[in-house]
């Protein structure tokens, strides 16, 4: 049963955003609730009342109701359970994506939107198949460490931490979320990280990604608001509401920490 897990306090909000947390009771291994909280924080700064629903096993995904869908990461066991449930949601999620619905997909969620992924054990798990990427495993190796990427289309830089065994390869109609400045990225080619397709943003960044990259959170929320209320909607600039939320490299954070 779909249920509301989080909602803005009552107030005079000019806008409303409905967020679907896909399998939020199962896929929350990497602090993904922090991404939900950041979406809510930024949306409220922009004048939007937020309602977050958990859409999980045997639930319908209402493509016309939700303005943002978040699909987080999980362990192989949970992902295999979800992979069995996803086909019932395929049509609605595919329609949502093709109609420019806003999606943030992290780690396992990113993998499951694609064609398939191969577990560390070598077992192939079928993905939802609504996007063209696929994920292979690797032997005795993981991509672990700090990572920095740059999105040339948006001229934005994102920072994160990666820890993944999978090697993801994008299809010809997909772009990476960003070009790798340092770190590994999607695979051993160390060229791109994540995916950007229509209004789908996928990444392997743990963290959670949005707490460290408020510029990306702002982009997701403003994209959703403009889609719902029109491109001419007047919204506060990023600098006006999030001037203190500057993305920082790990080295910068360490140098500013007070250990006294």
From Swiss-Prot:
<feature type="active site" description="Nucleophile">
    <location>
        <position position="107"/>
    </location>
</feature>
<comment type="subunit">
    <text>Forms a heterodimer with MurT.</text>
</comment>
<feature type="domain" description="GATase cobBQ-type">
    <location>
        <begin position="16"/>
        <end position="214"/>
    </location>
</feature>
<feature type="binding site">
    <location>
        <position position="142"/>
    </location>
    <ligand>
        <name>substrate</name>
    </ligand>
</feature>
<dbReference type="InterPro" id="IPR029062">
    <property type="entry name" value="Class_I_gatase-like"/>
</dbReference>
<dbReference type="GO" id="GO:0009236">
    <property type="term" value="P:cobalamin biosynthetic process"/>
</dbReference>
<dbReference type="InterPro" id="IPR033949">
    <property type="entry name" value="CobQ_GATase1"/>
</dbReference>
<comment type="function">
    <text>The lipid II isoglutaminyl synthase complex catalyzes the formation of alpha-D-isoglutamine in the cell wall lipid II stem peptide. The GatD subunit catalyzes the hydrolysis of glutamine to glutamate and ammonia. The resulting ammonia molecule is channeled to the active site of MurT.</text>
</comment>
<dbReference type="InterPro" id="IPR054859">
    <property type="entry name" value="isoglutsynth_GatD"/>
</dbReference>
<keyword id="KW-0133">Cell shape</keyword>
<dbReference type="InterPro" id="IPR043702">
    <property type="entry name" value="Lipid_II_synth_GatD"/>
</dbReference>
<dbReference type="GO" id="GO:0004359">
    <property type="term" value="F:glutaminase activity"/>
</dbReference>
<dbReference type="InterPro" id="IPR011698">
    <property type="entry name" value="GATase_3"/>
</dbReference>
<keyword id="KW-0961">Cell wall biogenesis/degradation</keyword>
<dbReference type="Pfam" id="PF07685">
    <property type="entry name" value="GATase_3"/>
</dbReference>
<comment type="pathway">
    <text>Cell wall biogenesis; peptidoglycan biosynthesis.</text>
</comment>
<keyword id="KW-0436">Ligase</keyword>
<keyword id="KW-0378">Hydrolase</keyword>
<dbReference type="GO" id="GO:0140282">
    <property type="term" value="F:carbon-nitrogen ligase activity on lipid II"/>
</dbReference>
<feature type="active site">
    <location>
        <position position="206"/>
    </location>
</feature>
<protein>
    <recommendedName>
        <fullName>Lipid II isoglutaminyl synthase (glutamine-hydrolyzing) subunit GatD</fullName>
        <ecNumber>6.3.5.13</ecNumber>
        <ecNumber>3.5.1.2</ecNumber>
    </recommendedName>
</protein>
<keyword id="KW-0315">Glutamine amidotransferase</keyword>
<keyword id="KW-0573">Peptidoglycan synthesis</keyword>
<dbReference type="GO" id="GO:0008360">
    <property type="term" value="P:regulation of cell shape"/>
</dbReference>
<comment type="similarity">
    <text>Belongs to the CobB/CobQ family. GatD subfamily.</text>
</comment>
<dbReference type="GO" id="GO:0071555">
    <property type="term" value="P:cell wall organization"/>
</dbReference>
<dbReference type="GO" id="GO:0009252">
    <property type="term" value="P:peptidoglycan biosynthetic process"/>
</dbReference>
């Amino acid at each position: 049963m779909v249920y509301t897990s989080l909602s803005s306090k009552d107030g005079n909000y000019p806008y409303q955003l409905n967020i679907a947390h896909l399998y939020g009771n199962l896929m929350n291994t990497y602090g993904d609730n922090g991404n939900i909280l950041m979406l809510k924080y930024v949306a409220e700064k922009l004048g939007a009342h937020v309602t977050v629903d958990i859409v999980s096993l045997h639930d319908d995904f209402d493509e016309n109701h939700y303005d943002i869908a978040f699909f987080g990461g999980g362990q192989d066991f949970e992902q295999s359970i979800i992979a069995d449930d996803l086909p019932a949601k395929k049509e609605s999620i595919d329609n949502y994506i093709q109609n420019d619905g806003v999606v943030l997909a992290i780690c396992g969620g990113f993998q499951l939107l694609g064609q398939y992924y191969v577990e560390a054990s070598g077992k192939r798990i079928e993905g939802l198949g609504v996007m063209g990427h696929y994920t292979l495993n690797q032997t005795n190796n993981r991509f672990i460490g700090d990572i920095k990427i740059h999105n040339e289309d948006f001229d934005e830089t994102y920072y994160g931490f990666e820890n993944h065994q999978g090697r993801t390869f994008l299809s010809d109609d997909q772009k990476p979320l960003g070009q790798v400045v340092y770190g590994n990225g999607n695979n051993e080619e160390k060229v791109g990280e994540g995916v950007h397709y229509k209004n789908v943003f996928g990444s392997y960044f743990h963290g959670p990604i949005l707490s460290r990259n408020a510029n990306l959170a702002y982009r997701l929320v403003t994209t959703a608001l403009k889609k719902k209320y029109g491109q001419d909607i007047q919204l506060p600039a990023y600098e006006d509401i999030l001037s203190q939320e500057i993305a920082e490299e790990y080295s910068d954070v360490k140098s500013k920490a007070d250990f006294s």
